Structures are given as C-alpha cells and as structure tokens.
Amino acid sequence: MTEAAKKSTKKPVDDGNFDKEIISRWPDLELSQTRFMLNHPEVDSSVKEAKLEKLQETIKEFDMAPFYELVCADFKIVVDATQLAAMKAANQKKIDEITAEVEDAEKNLGESEVRQGLLRKFEYYCQIGDKDNALKAYTATYEKTVGMGYRIDVVFAMIRVGLFFLDHHLINKFITKAKELMEQGGDWERKNRLRSYEALYRMSVRDFAGAADLFLEAVPTFGSYELMTYENLILYTVITTTFALDRPDLRTKVIRCNEVQEQLTGGGLNGTLIPVREYLESYYDCHYDRFFIQLAALESERFKFDRYLSPHFNYYSRGMRHRAYEQFLTPYKTVRIDMMAKDFGVSRAFIDRELHRLIATGQLQCRIDAVNGVIEVNHRDSKNHLYKAVIKDGDILLNRIQKLARVINA
C-alpha cells in the first residue's frame, strides 16, 4: 500500500461541523505514476517487473477491477479471469452493501446518514479506479451535500480523479467548479489546497508561468500531500520559476525563500534535491557549463519519468537554453562565438546552430558575423518597446470596451 493510501483509511465524519475532512485521499496518484513508468520505453525491464508486481499486489489488495483491466490492456497482459471475476464480485458486494445502507437511511434515518452513504460509494469508486461510476456518484453526492466545505472536498476528489487519468477536460471543469465554490465561502485551508491542485494542472498543460505563481504561494502553507510530497513541490517550484521568472524575482521569491532553501540545503530524501539545488545555483550564478550538465541530468533522470513533465521536457529544455543564452548575451554588444561555446562547455558548431534557430524565430535580438566569428547583440530600446506595448494593450482594451458597450446598448 502506498503512503497516500495508508492515510486514506479514515471514514467520513458528519457532525454538522464542516471543517472536518470527509473525503479520503483516493484515488492514489502514486498508482498512476507507476502505470506511467510501466509504459515508459526507457525504464529498465527489471525495474518494470518489480513495479508491476507491486502494482498487482495493490490492485488485488483493494479489489481494483476497473483499474486492473486498464493495466492489462496497457501492457498486453493476459487477464486472469478468476482474479477479475473475484474482484468484480467483491466490488459489487461492497456497492450493494453501501446502496442498502443508503436506502435504509432514506427510509429510517436522516439526510446526514444518506449523505454518509453516498460519500462512501463515491469514495469506493475512486478507490477502485472506476472513473465513469465515480462521476455518476459525484453528482448524487454533491446534490446531497449541503456544507460548503464538504462540497469543496467532493470537488477536490473529482479533480484527483481527473489527475489520476490525466483527463484535462475533467480537471479543468472541476477546478473551475472549486473556484466558484471558494468565492461563495471557502475557508483558508481549502483555498491553499486549491492553489496546489491548480498549479499541478497548469504545469501539466505547459503553463509554467501560471504554475510558478501558484507553487510559490503554496510553498509556505502546503498541505496537499494527497497530490505530491513536499519534496516534489520544491522540485516543481524550482523548475517552473526558473523558466518563468526574471532574475530579480527569482532572487527574491526563490533564492531568498527560506522554505525553498531549507529543503534544497538539506538535499531531500536520499539526496534527490541536490541536483535541483545545483541546477538553480548554476543558472542564477551564470556557470553555464555546469548549468547545461545539470539541465541534461534533470531532463534524463527526472523530467522524462515524471508523468506531468514528460510531454514537455523538450519544450522546457529549449526554453531554458534560450533563457541562458539571453542571460549570457545581455551584458555584451559583441562577443566571440568560440568564447560563448567555451563558457557553455559545448562545441562552436552547436552554439552556431542554436543561435541561428533562435535568431530566425525572433527569440534572440542579435546577428552572427560568420566571417569574423562574432555575435553582434542588438539591445532593444526599452522606451520604444514600452511604447509599442502600451499601444498594443491600449488597442485590446479599446476593443473590449467597445464590445461591452454594444452588449449594454443591445
């Protein structure tokens, strides 16, 4: 059983106090990470065998019949018909028991007991990895739930179902729902949790700037251990902020952040945050040869094997190389290509290729004098750039005002 699952055994409590947690931490997101690793072509076969064995033990322990069928389909494993039938029978028995409790509560007890039963059914579908039935049970549970805090917890559980299957439509739908409920009276603790949920979602859809702001807000008051460990929160915070923030903000919000530095200095469990610390320091301190080494190491050892970051690791790596080149070139009017290549610890041909690509797409404001082997940097006129930005933003604002006026006058 994973750590998240061990924490999820407590039953819902309903005494009219809506501050108590009523939804367990199912579905267990560690299981979906294991499923991702088993699908990854670069994971060693012996590692896959060990992970698959552990996953099957968890599936059997919790009678996860729907998830078992998904896993078998993923890895082309022959379905054990006897085991599947036994798990389905156990699932049906449990659902029948809960349904009977709900029916009895409707006849003989009150709304509180009915709500308890519906919550248990919803939680059970989450536990066994049955997305479709969890969504149906959510509707019934939500309609019977009257406390604002309780309703938000049910919505959080549906966001986790979306994260479990990386169903972005489902995640976005219920994050929007959670925000609407927060505006109606969500408490401080749940607002903090929502930041972590939304940050993880934004990172998974490549919105690193949006994720960075939310992760930074979540760091001092983090409590969403059903989503990730605190160590992973620090990893994601460093990864997104180095990509999204400029140097002054990176220094203020990350380099000087006590909570972040405490974790980075400690190195994390088994030293897993040491490369993250070296990555951040080498980038900020302009040790570009070390930065390239650390970026490549994180890419090959962490990003590729993280189900949220894996689809974006090439995009992230290109973006960070661009930021490093821009940071390097900023103080210069001209600089030799071979000097830049030496500072980055790569060949001149590599730097030449990279710069040509970025110049051609307008991402770097410079030109290459191939005859003399020199890069000529064209620094933007900040006033002219600001003037153009004001004109552009003013046009957008004017268009919106005109649209609003048409709506009001209609």
Swiss-Prot record:
Q: Which InterPro entries match?
A: PCI_dom, Rpn7/CSN1, Rpn7_N, RPN7_PSMD6_C, WH_DNA-bd_sf
Kindly state one GO CC term assigned in the UniProt record.
proteasome regulatory particle
Expression sites by tissue:
Expressed in multiple tissues including the intestine, pharynx and hypodermis.
Q: Name one Pfam family in it.
A: RPN7
**Gene3D superfamilies listed in its UniProt record:** 1.25.40.570
Q: Where is the PCI domain?
A: 207-382
Q: Which one GO biological process term can you cite for this protein? A: proteasome-mediated ubiquitin-dependent protein catabolic process
Which controlled-vocabulary keywords does the entry list?
Proteasome
The source's domain of life comes to: Eukaryota
Q: Which family does it belong to?
A: Belongs to the proteasome subunit S10 family.
Its biological function?
A: Acts as a regulatory subunit of the 26S proteasome which is involved in the ATP-dependent degradation of ubiquitinated proteins.
Protein name as catalogued? 26S proteasome non-ATPase regulatory subunit 6
Tell me which species this is from.
Answer: Caenorhabditis elegans
